[in-house]
Amino acid sequence: VAAVTSARRRCRIDVEIAIVRPAHPFMDGCAVRFTFPNGYTGSVIRHSGSYGGSQGLWEIAVMYDGVIVYDTPITDDVLGWQTEEDVKQVLNQIRALPKRAV
């Protein structure tokens, strides 16, 4: 329990725009997902193997229906080496994406 609480503190990103799954330990760091009404999710991770994780920075992936997508105007890959402010900006961009056509 103490390790989980510590991970949550280290992995806190304040965003008031999404349904947030609580941060949970992931590898030797943490992961949190922000899901928006448009069906998209921002998957945010930080651990020693993530892009920028060893420098205390974040990696973010754009997901839809639980799968990473590579065809959004935001990026065609995961975004590494992101500061907390960068993550907030990307999450706002994900929130603004139109729903995907079925």
Predicted regions and their residues:
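Catalytic phosphate/metal-binding cores of nucleic-acid and nucleotide-processing enzymes, i.e., regions
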Residues: 2-102
